[in-house]
A protein has these predicted regions:
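Extended, well-folded catalytic/binding cores that form a central cleft or groove in large enzyme
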Residues: 1-8, 18-150, 154
Length: 158
């Protein structure tokens, strides 16, 4: 299927294609267009619009487009629900929703700054979302506790 959204993706417009490709559509084609052209091109190209005002798969109150996709496609994986909270926090500037939201926001803005090609940015963003999903699903309780001070090392020495 073809999917279309606004160009220059940030948070939701990277998270949604990741969700679509991993759980909804095994062979998606993503199209990025200027916001003013998305609905028109969706009709012309028979593409499903998302994360654009006035379409089904978009923000609804405090929820973001990632939430809309989870609901429409009845995705009930608890790890996806947890990831949705992180995405929602980062995408709606509600960083209090999850401690990871601030990091996701920072990394997403960095990706957008580093890549001018939307599809290249998406490719790199998928790695990020694969890692976040793995954390939510399998390793959320793992910590990193290495402390060289406890091992008798002194950081002031070269």
């Amino acid at each position: 299927m073809k999917w279309i959204t606004r160009e220059r993706p940030k948070i939701d417009r990277i998270a949604c294609p990741w969700l679509i490709a991993r759980f909804i559509d095994k062979t998606p084609e993503f199209i990025f267009a200027p916001a003013r052209d998305v609905r028109r091109l969706a009709g012309e190209l028979k593409a499903i619009p998302f994360d654009i005002e006035g379409v089904e798969l978009s923000h609804d109150g405090p929820l973001c487009s990632f939430d809309a996709l989870l609901k429409k496609y009845e995705l009930t994986d608890p790890a996806l629900a947890e990831l949705a909270v992180i995405v929602r926090g980062a995408d709606t500037a509600r960083l209090d929703l999850a401690p990871q939201a601030a990091g996701l926001l920072a990394i997403s803005l960095g990706l957008s700054h580093n890549f001018t090609d939307d599809h290249e940015q998406l490719r790199h963003g998928f790695v990020l979302y694969d890692a976040l999903y793995a954390w939510c699903k399998d390793v959320r309780n793992e910590t990193h506790t290495w402390n060289p001070q406890r091992a008798g090392r002194n950081h002031s020495q070269a």
